[in-house]
Amino acid sequence: MRRRPFVAGLVPALLAPRSRAAVAPERAAASAPAAKIAGAASSTSVADDAMPRGVTHRALRFPADHGAHPDTHVEWWYVTGWLSGGGGGGEVDARTAPEFGFQVTFFRTRTGLAETSASRFAARQLVFAHVALIDLAAGAKDGGGSLHDQRAAREGFGFVQVPAASGTQVVQLRDWSMRREPTADASRLHIAVRSDRFALALDLAGTQGVLLQGDAGYSQKGPDPRQASHYYSEPQLAVRGRVERAGAPARAVTGRAWLDHEWSNEYLGAEALGWDWVGFNLLDGAALMAFRLRYADGSASWAGGSYRSAAGVLTTFAATEVRFEPQRRWTSPRTQAAYPVEWILTTPAGRWRVVALHDDQELDSRGSTGSIYWEGVSALRREDGGTVGYGYLELTGYAGRLRL
């Protein structure tokens, strides 16, 4: 499934004139409308019938579907991963234990407003970005290892959509960017983010093919056929680059990452509160994804997932075949939200323990998408405690119902 431009309440905020002096620094920065999405799969620069519109049972087409789909309500490009020191020229070792976890996410939402306006200021599309870095050693010592930042912008002033056939796809919000290079054999992405307290400059290289989630990229999110998305993943991305923290020298790092790209017109059912999601790169080269949408009483309204073995054999999970069982909760001292940070996860591919590598990985994004959620680097372990992979756990709807 995945991700999540939790945008309720943000449209009026971005439409209204605001004094930069009247908001916090990160919110003032967010108001600058300088967003760009290049490589759109459907845009005003291509014919209306160039791509199927909306979410339908269709074959995904690449490289076009790496780009934006502005005819849909919500869309995200979501990269999470783990890093460790050692940026030499050798092969990236997927078995090295994490020193850092990182998240870089770009969201796009179609507001449904000013659709016929010719004004460059019309907020037809909004773009948001979240970035986070967790230093596991620093976090274990003093709780100060978790850093994050956010931005938001409305369409206009450099928000550009160009045909995917032009080659390179770019998702950019001012100087934060995720750029995909066209290559014949595998994905190659470049991420550049600089915040006041940290910076990331990462190169990601595909080691496997695209993983189409659900029914060949059509992912059901509920019993209503309208509750669906187009969804694909790129697991086992080899990462190489640099991490900087304020007051510390830059570190050369390598690691592994997971990319999700998903777009939808309707996600949550009326009674759903939020969701739980995991994406793990296993040490043997396999990939595991599982999710459940959740009612207020904690029961699942829908679920799904997939497991692709190191040999490339794909198993897709039915809604009734995935079970999340919370084992331990951490309560945020800031919001009092209680997040399950350890789980027993049962799927047709196996039964595992999901364990957060640091409890405090709560993200307050009320300055952009209006939500508070938990997103953190975690380990996937056998029931006997042996680690079989690393990845990310995402928990939404614990600090209040999520509204898309």
Language model region names:
Residues 5-27:
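N-terminal export signals
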Residues 22-404:
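Structured soluble/peripheral alpha/beta segments that form catalytic or ligand/cofactor-binding pockets
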